[in-house]
Swiss-Prot record:
Phylogenetic classification of the source organism: Eukaryota, Metazoa, Chordata, Craniata, Vertebrata
Source organism of this protein record: Homo sapiens (Human)
Annotated Pfam families: DALR_1, tRNA-synt_1d
Protein name: Probable arginine--tRNA ligase, mitochondrial
PROSITE patterns noted in UniProt: AA_TRNA_LIGASE_I (PS00178)
Catalyses which reaction(s): tRNA(Arg) + L-arginine + ATP = L-arginyl-tRNA(Arg) + AMP + diphosphate
Disease annotated for this entry: Pontocerebellar hypoplasia 6: A disorder characterized by an abnormally small cerebellum and brainstem, infantile encephalopathy, generalized hypotonia, lethargy and poor feeding. Recurrent apnea, intractable seizures occur early in the course of this condition.
Outcome of substituting H530Y: No effect on mitochondrial membrane localization
UniProt cross-references to SUPFAM superfamilies, sorted A to Z: Anticodon-binding domain of a subclass of class I aminoacyl-tRNA synthetases (SSF47323), Arginyl-tRNA synthetase (ArgRS), N-terminal 'additional' domain (SSF55190), Nucleotidylyl transferase (SSF52374)
CDD domains from the UniProt entry: ArgRS_core (cd00671)
Phenotypic consequence of A10V: In PCH6; uncertain significance
Transit peptide interval: 1-16
Amino acid sequence: MACGFRRAIACQLSRVLNLPPENLITSISAVPISQKEEVADFQLSVDSLLEKDNDHSRPDIQVQAKRLAEKLRCDTVVSEISTGQRTVNFKINRELLTKTVLQQVIEDGSKYGLKSELFSGLPQKKIVVEFSSPNVAKKFHVGHLRSTIIGNFIANLKEALGHQVIRINYLGDWGMQFGLLGTGFQLFGYEEKLQSNPLQHLFEVYVQVNKEAADDKSVAKAAQEFFQRLELGDVQALSLWQKFRDLSIEEYIRVYKRLGVYFDEYSGESFYREKSQEVLKLLESKGLLLKTIKGTAVVDLSGNGDPSSICTVMRSDGTSLYATRDLAAAIDRMDKYNFDTMIYVTDKGQKKHFQQVFQMLKIMGYDWAERCQHVPFGVVQGMKTRRGDVTFLEDVLNEIQLRMLQNMASIKTTKELKNPQETAERVGLAALIIQDFKGLLLSDYKFSWDRVFQSRGDTGVFLQYTHARLHSLEETFGCGYLNDFNTACLQEPQSVSILQHLLRFDEVLYKSSQDFQPRHIVSYLLTLSHLAAVAHKTLQIKDSPPEVAGARLHLFKAVRSVLANGMKLLGITPVCRM
């Protein structure tokens, strides 16, 4: 993309360098606004054209850049060519820049930036994304919330790029906790409470039975026996377990809907209780399964007894473990979906677990293990509601809504809203997501409610405010002015800065699609919003001549469109009034 300008520059370079234009596309980039000391719109990195060896000293590259620039000519697209630090710089014809960018944004709509030449030639893939994955009856902690919003972003971006994406929620719905839960429900459970608030009641039962099991060995033994009955397929035990699972999923779906998140498949460890036994047999048949003195079964991934490379795959009573069920799930998904890539989104504490799972798949003879990828993220500290620690996702959403409603009530400029609760939740979620996505996903960060809800500065509230403000401009002036426009009316520095920034959207999407880091898009949208705020003050529409007003309105409409596109990719629903 960059509206075809990048390709036009690549075509001219290809004639001089005798290289196909396709080989040059990724070496040509739009110049970020913050670096615009000069007037260039695009730059060619001379380093990226040369072989990366030590023979190319800095002066040589600078000389080559100068020689290359001298061989190039200005044309109807490029109005000026110059050299920078190891770069050749290109300035685009101003009227052409204005007309082409604005036309492209309006014509491409939600696809702006995604039809870029940066993405052409990339094969369409089938991608499985496993994310969120809470444990039934345990706390839906902040790690699950991070997994949910990060996984949703990755799935959104891959889908927008035309890939077939399968979103899987792999629930922790099996294991020893269900022995405790089954026993606990028989002791302390109430059917009415289970039906009215399943997640809350199961959690209360789970906490209570854990306390009892710690003090009373007979309760711990009963829990162990209940789980063994589950593993052996006891009808009564399975019926109770199924009820817990079904009611929990109904509740999850309702809460995920508030987040704007959905899944194509609600899977879980329980699906693989039988298939995990097949995995154990396969490991044994390949001579990879080793029995320990304690009666457990392990796989030695080092081959030389290194304790750090030992992975336990079976308990002494023959029941399966998390790793075994993950192996069975991966094999089943390949059979079912024949995926090109499978992405697991979990906290960085599971890094070793996934390394071992992928390694075991490989030594079992599954070459496609290389298509599996773990996207780890850091820990969030200090997220508490007013009632204390976060227990369930719904607590977070309710807290967001409450705090945002209070904020909106205290601001004089808040508009009369048809549904203030919905607006508050959408703005609050934007605030939460932007705070989370601003840094590297792998970084830990300290959560602050006060910082999240600041309306000024680099926050989600600021993005939503900018979108609502631009939408209000269109509502107020749109009918009279949104016809044809004169590009000569958008030559002020504020207009040009916005147009230059809009040029870069495809590069930002490309970067995020390569490293799965949403911060590139977040940074881009925040800069766009700051540029729009400056332009809104200086580029008046009211009382301007119709030709000027129309051109400016087109510019602001393009900004709002790209802002909305980027926000939706991040998992944010833009608001039109606030």
